[in-house]
Curated annotation (Swiss-Prot):
The keyword DNA damage applies. The lineage of its organism: Eukaryota, Metazoa, Chordata, Craniata, Vertebrata. This is BRISC and BRCA1-A complex member 2. Residues 275-364 are annotated as: UEV-like 2. Keywords: Acetylation, Apoptosis, Cell cycle, Cell division, Chromatin regulator, Cytoplasm, DNA damage, DNA repair, Mitosis, Nucleus, Phosphoprotein, Repeat, Ubl conjugation pathway. The keyword Transcription does not apply. Belongs to the BABAM2 family. GO terms for biological process: apoptotic process; cell division; chromatin organization; double-strand break repair; mitotic G2 DNA damage checkpoint signaling; positive regulation of DNA repair; response to ionizing radiation. The modification N-acetylmethionine is found at M1. The modification Phosphoserine is found at S2. Component of the BRCA1-A complex, a complex that specifically recognizes 'Lys-63'-linked ubiquitinated histones H2A and H2AX at DNA lesions sites, leading to target the BRCA1-BARD1 heterodimer to sites of DNA damage at double-strand breaks (DSBs). The BRCA1-A complex also possesses deubiquitinase activity that specifically removes 'Lys-63'-linked ubiquitin on histones H2A and H2AX. It is found in: Cytoplasm; Nucleus. CDD domains: BRE (cd23664). GO terms for cellular component: BRCA1-A complex; BRISC complex; cytoplasm; nucleus.
């Protein structure tokens, strides 16, 4: 159910509270997922004109789980705060004295429900942390992370028994990694979706037993960051080492991700330098180039009255990864009607060269390769 459809069924006096939650509500670390409501119902009599829904189920992301809490208002007394039922978490009994926004409920503030929900989630986090006492090993993992503010202040935990019959205990740690994404080129962060949310990297580590013999890490990137770093398959984090600890493993993942970000930033500046050098060396031979991301360049050149194009594709992780040169005849066609072309990656190249050196080496390579390309075009292409 879309937020607009849900809100149209809510009692008008309660609608501002719920609207603030579903339209602007960001609770917890996973800011890429908005809160949503389902199971709208009414406690009013059948004679009450609609819309009159005043109770619903709130879905919230937390530590890789989805919390489903029932929120119950009374449409007849909309100035009163709601009741909460915490679904499967029957053991969760929040401390009313710590719920300041519930005790001083202000119905004139549209965000009062959202503020109460945030307070409840904070208490729920403490409730989950307390459950780790059932495992000294998992408690150690938690306490060592807690001693590091960059991790301890950005962590969610979900713990509990996997199997009530065997007593197996499991836990999941979700951490917001302290990685700086602010210098990623803006062109890489475009066109993902209209409201991408916060740029964030979340590391989920699941302990399937109390002795940490089965540990499964997974990295989650917000959509813009995943796109900027080359897609979901571009970053592979190491397996959790046998006998390892989170306090050692998490910095390794941070370091890996930071290096990946630096590669992308460096690649952008190096590509810009590369294209600037080619503009200088080839002048009017430049047909077009990508002036935003500096990922493509096309040259129109001539060798002994033979005109040809060179398309240069610069990869995301340039200069570590070598550009592809595609030579294309302007006269000859393939059987499918395409201009005859050959792609080359086997040419003199070093990632240590600056843009000027790369342009000079490319010009020299063009002179040696074009004769055989021309011969191949005449032999295999059609005029």
């Amino acid at each position: 159910m879309s937020p607009e459809v849900a809100l149209n069924r809510i009692s008008p006096m309660l609608s501002p509270f719920i609207s603030s939650v579903v339209r602007n509500g960001k609770v917890g670390l996973d800011a890429t997922n908005c809160l949503r409501i389902t199971d709208l119902k009414s406690g009013c009599t059948s004679l009450t004109p609609g819309p009159n829904c005043d109770r619903f189920k709130l879905h919230m992301p937390y530590a890789g789980e989805t919390l489903k809490w029932d929120i119950i208002f009374n449409a007849q007394y909309p100035e009163l705060p709601p009741d909460f039922i915490f679904g499967e978490d029957a053991e969760f009994l929040p401390d009313p004295s710590a719920l300041q926004n519930l005790a001083s409920w202000n119905p004139s503030n549209p965000e009062c429900l959202l503020l109460v929900v945030k307070e409840l989630v904070q208490q729920y986090h403490q409730f989950q942390c307390s459950r780790l006492r059932e495992s000294s090993r998992l408690m150690f993992e938690y306490q060592t992370l807690l001693e590091e503010p960059q991790y301890g202040e950005n962590m969610e935990i979900y713990a509990g028994k996997k199997n009530n019959w065997t007593g197996e205990f499991s836990a999941r740690f979700l951490l917001k990694l302290p990685v700086d994404f602010s210098n990623i080129p803006t062109y890489l962060l475009k066109d993902v979706n209209e409201d991408p949310g916060e740029d964030v990297a979340l590391l989920s580590v699941s302990f399937e037993d109390t002795e940490a013999t089965q540990v499964y890490p997974k990295l989650y990137l917000s959509p813009r960051i995943e796109h900027a770093l080359g897609g979901s398959s571009a970053l592979h984090i190491p397996a959790f080492p046998g006998g390892g600890c989170l306090i050692d493993y998490v910095p390794q993942v941070c370091h890996l991700l930071t290096n990946k970000v630096q590669y992308v930033i460096q690649g952008y500046h190096k590509r810009r330098e590369y294209i600037a050098a080619f503009l200088s060396h080839f002048g009017t031979g430049v047909v077009e180039y990508d002036a935003e991301g500096f990922t493509k360049l096309t040259l129109l050149l001539m060798w002994k009255d033979f005109c040809f194009l060179v398309h240069i594709d610069l990869p995301l992780f340039f200069p570590r990864d070598q550009p592809t040169l595609t030579f294309q005849s302007v006269y000859h066609f393939t059987n499918s009607g395409q201009l005859y072309s050959q792609a080359q990656k086997n040419y003199p190249y070093s990632p240590r060269w600056d843009g000027n050196e790369m342009a000079k080496r490319a010009k020299a390579y063009f002179k040696t390769f074009v004769p055989q390309f021309q011969e191949a075009a005449f032999a295999n292409g059609k005029l």
